[in-house]
């Protein structure tokens, strides 16, 4: 069963989505979004997992599926953070 996770990569990518298998260096996410920027008030990437994107965060559009390579961490996402990720507006510059 897919669970909500925040994934970081060696290339400094930060992604939210739903994963079945998070073992190994590669992770596939569905209904995924990336975090382009987060403000200091987010408290780092762990804050993105515990609280979701704060005001001022820049969140990319949702994609159906993404395969991430060279994964450095997988963090469980709280239900409150899931709601914030799902509600975040798409940053368009």
Provide a role label for each language-model segment.
Residues 1-93:
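Conserved RNA-binding domains used in RNP assembly and mRNA/RNA metabolism
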